[in-house]
């Protein structure tokens, strides 16, 4: 309300008071009415906060940055931090004289995310494996069991070509954005044969001659 100067008489109306686009002579009742009107004054929060920027899995606890969040206007609750890649839900509740644009002070839910980290390369066989009559498995470059699970044919005995598969775990994705299994070929080479000859293992037969 606005109080304006009036006449010099101390016994009459000394000021005018206006509120809610109305104007009347000052009185105790009007002052109280103005105070009551101000007591129910509300301030509107124009937008519910939203996640600003992106988060990527690091293995550590992270919290999002919020666009439109002011702790003097609202409280934050729900899930406000996380470790694993995925979607979480925070809540925002107006405090004091603040309300949402719908006039309520009810908590509003807002989703936020932590994205999967990237696995840049599909594992590949490193080194060679040669047939030895026993089951063998290859060594893999770029393979980390915390990032990828291995499947398909992981070991074999005979010489030949085989196919293993690699699938990102829940916090990882391939560089193309996919999370499905990718195949990787690996081989067991043929062993090199050898023949050992000794004098005791040989016998020679000569044809009989007449004469």
Put a short name on every predicted segment.
Residues 1-42:
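A signal for long, low-complexity, Ser/Thr/Asn-enriched, surface-exposed stalk/shaft
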Residues 41-211:
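Solvent-exposed beta-strand/loop surfaces, strongest in extracytoplasmic domains of secreted
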């Amino acid at each position: 309300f606005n109080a304006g100067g009036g006449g010099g008489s101390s016994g009459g109306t000394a000021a005018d008071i206006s509120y809610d686009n109305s104007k009347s002579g000052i009185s105790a009742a009007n002052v109280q009415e103005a105070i009551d009107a101000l007591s129910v004054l509300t301030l509107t929060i124009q937008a519910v906060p939203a996640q600003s920027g992106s988060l990527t899995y690091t293995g550590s606890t992270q919290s999002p940055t919020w666009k439109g969040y002011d702790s003097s206007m609202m409280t934050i609750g729900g899930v406000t931090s996380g470790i694993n890649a995925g979607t979480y839900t925070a809540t925002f509740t107006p405090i004091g004289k603040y309300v949402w644009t719908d006039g309520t002070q009810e908590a509003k839910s807002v989703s936020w995310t932590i994205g999967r980290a990237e696995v840049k390369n599909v594992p590949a066989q490193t080194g060679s494996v040669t047939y030895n009559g026993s089951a063998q498995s290859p060594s893999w470059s770029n393979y980390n069991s915390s990032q990828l699970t291995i499947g398909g044919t992981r070991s074999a005995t005979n010489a030949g070509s085989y196919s293993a598969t690699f699938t990102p775990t829940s916090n990882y994705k391939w560089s193309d954005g996919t999370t499905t299994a990718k195949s990787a070929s690996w081989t067991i080479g043929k062993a090199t044969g050898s023949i050992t000859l000794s004098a005791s293992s040989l016998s020679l037969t000569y044809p009989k001659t007449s004469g």
